A protein has these predicted regions:
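Short intracellular "coupling" helices and adjacent cytoplasmic loop segments at the cytosolic face
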Residues: 121, 286-298
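Basic terminal extensions of ribosome/translation-associated proteins
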Residues: 296, 318-320, 452
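Intrinsically disordered, low-complexity regions
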Residues: 307, 314-321, 325
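Intracellular alpha-helical coupling/juxtamembrane segments of multi-pass membrane proteins
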Residues: 260-284, 296, 300-314
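Short, flexible active-site-proximal loops enriched in glycine and acidic residues
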Residues: 163, 276, 315-319
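ABC ATP-binding cassette signature C-motif
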Residues: 1-271, 322, 326-454
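Generic structural signal for secondary-structure transition and capping sites
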Residues: 219, 283, 290, 312-315, ...
Length: 454
């Protein structure tokens, strides 16, 4: 059940109780309960596929759990990225973001109308003036004098240039659209933000701006992120979803790691001691049975019950989290000279993006390409892949085969399963080989049959 009529209990803005959900007879999670309190900044962590985004959908009312309740306090507005996806056809980047303040624009229009009516000295002037003063006060108290400057500040903070602000929003790349949707969410007026990987597509300066925004944000935020440094900078609580259950900790990510290590060490020590005790008791049971007297069998039965109770109460320490393990092995050996670029230049709409780029890569080198958003890093990759034409010379060495990982992954068929998507790319592989390859990237069991979009 999703209920927005709940009276807040203490400082809680949202309460989740006993959430449970399954997909295709597979239990995703159960007994999930937690509170989000005023000014909480919560890091929500867990391995991919455990259900973090699914819980966000439940909290925002987009998905109903099989069991459990979500209570939201009165006057709490939840902001979730998917609610702000998509842009209007004819809007610029600036006007698209400004649209979240449409209520201020309506106030401005009414204030102009009231001013015109008052100027005519019509009847009911006292009523008109009273309405004007009330509306003006409401406009100013709610931020009407600063919303345009806040719009510009958010765009600049997230890496948009002055020129970008005047571009049609529909011409933005996938990464830029994600940033624009993030800006819309941040400025939406929501007082409880659900942020799912908010640092994706952000450069260092933009991440720093986002950190500052969240620290100053007077509402609460729950943040899914794999960026531990970002979580350390902005969070004061941590929730971990693991093996279908949720555990809450006070403190940021680093503090969570230390606490969890201590808990696991204590649990491992207790587990080992209990295993020793069970073996000791079972040794007594075996000995009593060998002695074979009636009173020995009574003692053996009593001790066996004691051992069974200990076994039932055993809590096994959590295994170390699985990590992705793979090696990059070229299908053939290249020459020593892998890539040479000379005087690469490219312009868009008559404006140079970059020029005079020279590059020489040799076999065995690992190169990190660093630069602000919009400076042309992805464009350079697309030039190398032949997707953009540029001035200058590009020469690949002997036996060089290029692999390209696109940040948007536009070539993926979201309706296919992970298994079929990889198998279609490598039809000569057996299903076992494909599933083994997927397993190295932690696609286990039925996960390989899920549509890519999930």
């Amino acid at each position: 059940m999703y209920d927005k009529t709940w009276e807040a209990c203490g400082l809680a803005l949202l309460r989740a109780q006993n959430l449970r959900l399954s997909f295709s007879d597979r239990l995703l999670f159960e007994n999930i309960s937690f509170d989000v309190e005023n000014r909480d900044k919560i890091g929500f962590i867990g391995a991919n596929g455990v259900g973090k985004t699914t819980i966000f959908k439940i909290l925002s009312g987009q998905l109903q759990p099989a069991q459990g309740d979500v209570f939201v306090a009165k006057d709490i507005q939840i902001g979730y990225m998917e609610q702000h996806a998509g842009v209007e056809k004819d809007r610029t980047v600036y006007s698209e973001l400004l649209s979240v303040f449409s209520h201020f624009e309506k106030m401005e229009q009414e204030l102009e109308l009231l001013a015109a009516q008052i100027e005519k000295n019509g009847k009911d002037i006292d009523t008109l003036v009273a309405r004007q003063l009330s509306l003006q006060e409401q406009y100013e108290n709610n931020g009407g004098l600063t919303y345009k400057s806040r719009t510009r500040a958010a765009l600049l903070g997230l890496g948009f240039t002055e020129a970008d602000m005047h571009r049609p929003a529909l011409t933005l790349s996938g990464g830029q659209l994600s940033k624009l949707n993030l800006a819309k969410l941040l400025l939406s007026g929501a007082n409880l933000l659900l942020l799912d990987e908010p640092t994706n597509h952000l450069d260092i300066a933009s991440v720093e701006w986002l950190e500052s925004f969240i620290k100053d944000f007077k509402g609460a935020a729950v943040i899914i992120s794999h960026d531990r440094y970002f979580l350390d900078a902005v969070t004061n609580k941590t929730m971990e979803l693991s093996h279908g259950h949720l555990t809450a900790y006070s403190g940021n990510y680093t503090q969570f790691i230390k606490k969890k290590e201590k808990i696991n060490e204590d649990l491992k020590r207790r587990y080992e001691n209990e295993i020793k005790e069970i073996k000791r008791i079972e040794g007594i049971v075996e000995q009593q049975r060998r002695w074979g007297q009636s009173h020995n069998f009574i003692t053996a039965a009593s001790k066996q019950k004691q051992a069974d109770r200990l076994k039932k109460a055993l809590v096994k320490p959590e295994d170390d989290a699985q990590a992705i393990h793979f090696s990059l092995t070229p299908r053939r050996e290249s020459g020593n000279d892998v890539l040479q670029c000379r005087d690469l230049s490219i312009s868009f709409d008559g404006k140079p993006l970059f020029e005079g780029v020279n590059l020489h890569l040799t076999k065995g080198q690992r190169v990190f390409l660093l630069g602000a958003n919009g400076c042309g890093k992805t464009t350079l990759f697309k030039i190398l892949m032949g997707k953009h034409h540029a001035q200058g010379e590009i020469r690949f060495g002997a036996n060089v085969d290029v692999g390209y990982f696109d940040q948007v992954q536009a070539d993926l068929n979201l309706e296919k399963s992970a298994l079929d998507e990889v198998w279609d790319a490598f039809p000569n592989m057996s299903q076992t080989q494909v599933r083994t390859a997927l397993g190295t990237f932690l696609f286990k069991g039925d996960d390989v049959f899920k549509p890519v979009k999930l």
